[in-house]
Each structure stands twice: as structure tokens, then as C-alpha cells.
């Protein structure tokens, strides 16, 4: 008997909240880092280890929950992830030492990764082609809003209840998503589920990683994520220290740039297909990053920098939507693993690029990271699109020949 399907509205809200785990788990407690050093009587570097641990957990956890959800289904895997998230968050609140807190942040990141990776897998289960791209664009827009809202909400909650108040809110969010997971109807039928033997898991990973087109799409996604994290890591110093903006002015500009990503991710689905959106977005990224690189080296004024950064991040949002949709469409039969690798490589590139942004002259370093990331992502996009276009040309030629043969047959019959 076919199970009852969730409404589209519920699916959008639920998947959007799951995908927002990344920014909420990572960014929400940033305003309280200085006060936590006093609470745990430790150094700032030890407190920042909690942020590093959560990022590692968010990357590694996707490689765990992706294959697990392919075997046991999305709903049961979500329930396990949400329960683990609640337990680890409660543990963070009750932590007495910084080492306990860091260890539990790692577990919290792994659990949060379950929500992120399974949300994309559910979208791939339920939608395909342009509909999948539209759903991922909506999820990306919600994720972009969460990126803006997380530090602002964290600052507000820290005024009320300190860092404990922030983690109490995360606990409340986990309860809501656990309830949503109970209400969610399984999207992966038992016939579609994969064997969980280690040999089969490794075989499926090998199958996915041998798909060159998929690899190009996720590499393009990861390199674009590197451009985004280069901006996140450098923008506070460029805007506040170099251009002299106040924290409030910086927050407004940071929020405006995030909104640019939200808008462009929805614009991407207006293209005829996602390949056109990826081609346009990656080309525009390369052009804008080249101009921004030159502007930062020459010492431009603030409004030139902000205008170029705004436009660059808009193209980042567009390529995120296109490359993630194309990657997931390439490996529909291994959606969990495909989603896991996509998310893991994104956080991996983000983790590599973030510390590099602080080396040397930050204006020059940031400009170089923007240019290098955009150039490499453009090359990956071009390679993937060229493979598709060559296949399409061959297919078109075959259909053309068949049509000519059919027409010749009709003429002979007459």
C-alpha cells in the first residue's frame, strides 16, 4: 500500500529547517566566545576548538548519515540524528570543562550533519530535473536566511541567557525537528534501499566517485564554497579594520550580501536548465573575482569593494543551486552517498580556505583566494558541461539521422 505523502509546504519548511543546521550549529554561539573563556577559565584558542570540532563533525557526519540513510531509510536515520543532537546539545549545556564541551560539539556537529545530508537526499527522492533544482533553490534560500539570522539571534539570546541560552534554543529547535521527523513519511521505498555490507558501501562510493561529471560538479561546488568562506573569513577585517565600519554597519553589509545569495539562488531556476545557470554563474564569478582582485590590489574605496562583493556572492548563490542540483541528478540511485560527498567536500574546502584568509596582507590574500577559487571552479564547470554537450551532440546527431531515415522511407513508400 502506498504511504501518504507529506504536503509540499511541510516538505519545504521541514527540509529548509534541516538544511539550516549548518549555520545555526556553527555560527549561533559566536557572540559568546569571549564570555566562554571566562566561564571555562581557559584560552580563546581552546574555546575556538569548539567551532573547529563542529565543522569537522558537520563534514564527517555527512559521510556517515548519507550511506546509513540509503540503507535504513530517511525517516529512521533522521530520528537517530535528532535524538543524538538532543543528547549532545544537553551535554553541551551541562559541560563542566572545555574538553567536555569540545567533544560534545563534535558529536553535535555529526548529528547536525544528518539533517543537512538527509534533507538533500529527500529532495532527490521526491523530485528530479527542474523540480529538484527549484526545491534545492528554496532550501538554499532558507539556508541563506539562517546564515544571516544565526549570529543576530545568537547575539540577542546571549544578552538574555548567555551561551547557555543559545544552546537551550538549539535544544528547542532539536525538539521541533524531532517532532517533524516523526510526522515525516518515508521517501525511500524498501525496494530502493541499499545493502549495508561494508563491501557494498565501498563499492557504491567507488561507483559514485568514478562518475567524472558528478565529480566535476561537486568540485565546482566545493571550490565555490571556498570563495564563500574566503569572504566570511576576510570580510570582518576588511570592512571593520580597513574601511572603518562599525559592528552594526558590518552586520548590515554582511546581511545584504547574504540576501544577494538568497535572491540569486531563486533566479537560477528561471534559466532554461541548470547547465545554463551554471555556465552563466561560473563565468560571471570569474569575471567579478578578477575585477575584485585588481581593485583590492590597487586599493579601491569601500563602495567599489562592497558592490563587487555583493555581485560576486550573488553568482556564488546561483552556482550553488545549479551545481548541487546537477550533482544530485547525476547519482539519483545513490542519493545518500552523493549528498554526503557534496556536503563533505563543501565543508572541507571551507575549512581549508578560512585560515588562509588571515595570512599576510588580508586585502591581497582575499583577492587572490577569490580569483583562484573562481578560476578553478570555472574550469570544473566547463569540463562537466563540455562532457554533457558532447553527449548531447552525439544524441542529436543520432536522432537527426533517424528522422532522415524515416523521411526517406515515407518517400519510397509513396
Indicate where each model-derived feature is located.
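Paired small-residue
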Residues: 84, 88-91, 99-107, 303-311
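Conserved MFS/SLC helix-loop-helix module at the cytosolic interface between two early adjacent transmembrane helices
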Residues: 60-99
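Juxtamembrane intracellular "pre-TM" segments in multi-pass secondary transporters
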Residues: 2-4, 186-217
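Helix-loop-helix hairpin linking two adjacent transmembrane segments in secondary transporters
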Residues: 100, 129, 137-182
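Cytoplasmic helix-loop-helix junction between adjacent transmembrane helices
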Residues: 104-145
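C-terminal transmembrane helical hairpin of 12-TM major facilitator-type secondary transporters
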Residues: 278-322
Amino acid at each position: 500500500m502506498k504511504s501518504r505523502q507529506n504536503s509540499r509546504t511541510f516538505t519545504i519548511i521541514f527540509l529548509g529547517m534541516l538544511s539550516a543546521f549548518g549555520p545555526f550549529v556553527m555560527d549561533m554561539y559566536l557572540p559568546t566566545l569571549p564570555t566562554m573563556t571566562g566561564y571555562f577559565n581557559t584560552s580563546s584558542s581552546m574555546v575556538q576548538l569548539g567551532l573547529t570540532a563542529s565543522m569537522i563533525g558537520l563534514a564527517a557526519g555527512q559521510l556517515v548519515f548519507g550511506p546509513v540513510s540509503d540503507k535504513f531509510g530517511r525517516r529512521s536515520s533522521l530520528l537517530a540524528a535528532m535524538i543524538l543532537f538532543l543528547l549532545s546539545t544537553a551535554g553541551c549545556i551541562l559541560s563542566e570543562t572545555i574538553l567536555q564541551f569540545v567533544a560534545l560539539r563534535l558529536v553535535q556537529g555529526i548529528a547536525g550533519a544528518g539533517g543537512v545530508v538527509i534533507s538533500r537526499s529527500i529532495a532527490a527522492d521526491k523530485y528530479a530535473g527542474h523540480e529538484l533544482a527549484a526545491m534545492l533553490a528554496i532550501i538554499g534560500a532558507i539556508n541563506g536566511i539562517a546564515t544571516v539570522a544565526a549570529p543576530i539571534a545568537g547575539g540577542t539570546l546571549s544578552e538574555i541567557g548567555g551561551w547557555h541560552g543559545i544552546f537551550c534554543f538549539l535544544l528547542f529547535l532539536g525538539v521541533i525537528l524531532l517532532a517533524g521527523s516523526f510526522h515525516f513519511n518515508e521517501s525511500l521505498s524498501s525496494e530502493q534501499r541499499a545493502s549495508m555490507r561494508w563491501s557494498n558501501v565501498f563499492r557504491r562510493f567507488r561507483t559514485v566517485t568514478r562518475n567524472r561529471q558528478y565529480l566535476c560538479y561537486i568540485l565546482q561546488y566545493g571550490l565555490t564554497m571556498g570563495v564563500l568562506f574566503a569572504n566570511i573569513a576576510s570580510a570582518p577585517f576588511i570592512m571593520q579594520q580597513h574601511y572603518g565600519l562599525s559592528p552594526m554597519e558590518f552586520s548590515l553589509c554582511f546581511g545584504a550580501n547574504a540576501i544577494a545569495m538568497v535572491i540569486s539562488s531563486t533566479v537560477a531556476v528561471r534559466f532554461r536548465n541548470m547547465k545554463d545557470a551554471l555556465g552563466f554563474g561560473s563565468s560571471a564569478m570569474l569575471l567579478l573575482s578578477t575585477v575584485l582582485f585588481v581593485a583590492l590590489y590597487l586599493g579601491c574605496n569601500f563602495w567599489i569593494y562592497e558592490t563587487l562583493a555583493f555581485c560576486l556572492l550573488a553568482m556564488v548563490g546561483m552556482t550553488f543551486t545549479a551545481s548541487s542540483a546537477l550533482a544530485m541528478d547525476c547519482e539519483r540511485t545513490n542519493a545518500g552517498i552523493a549528498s554526503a560527498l557534496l556536503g563533505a567536500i563543501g565543508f572541507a574546502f571551507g575549512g581549508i580556505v578560512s585560515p588562509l584568509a588571515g595570512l599576510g596582507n588580508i586585502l591581497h590574500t582575499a583577492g587572490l583566494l577569490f580569483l583562484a577559487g573562481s578560476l578553478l571552479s570555472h574550469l570544473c564547470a566547463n569540463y562537466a558541461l563540455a562532457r554533457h554537450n558532447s553527449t548531447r551532440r552525439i544524441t542529436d546527431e543520432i536522432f537527426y539521422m533517424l528522422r532522415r531515415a524515416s523521411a526517406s522511407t515515407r518517400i519510397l513508400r509513396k
